[in-house]
Amino acid sequence: KITTIIVTHDSYEAFYLGHKCAIILDGQIKQFDDPYNVYHFPNSVEVVNFLNRGILIPAKVTGENSLENDDLGTINGNFIKHYPKGSNVQLLLQPEDLEHDDKSNLKLEVVDRKFRGTNFIYTLKTSSDLLIPVFVHSHHEHQHEADEKFGIKRPIHIDHIVCF
């Protein structure tokens, strides 16, 4: 075994190469963990912003395993940190958290679509002008263009809900 320290500003590179990752901001270690946990369980808004792998949207805790967002409705899942019912939080929404469904009644406007090989990343706009990134497998036959409506599967379920 050889211990190696790699310094990079590319989180994909860090996740791919590292057994452990340290997020260092302003000379302080903000999070030190394995890459999976750094990505799925960031411990602060600073880490979320540094990774730039999702957005924070306003939500209200409505139950032990649910919260509500004005644009997306009810979101169910498993909270990483529990908050009292009625708490206003910032929900981390990552591109893989929402699923596309052409038949859904929850429709968002397509602002942009980028091809990334195995998937497309769509940028969707909500009724309150939030811009939400969503991954869709590139084999999906119906590709949406800008200004088209894009269905989001309901109920929305996120395996691990991260809030601040």
Mark where each language-model region is.
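Internal alpha/beta loop-helix hairpins
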Residues: 2-73
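Non-catalytic connector elements of ABC transporters
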Residues: 54, 64-164
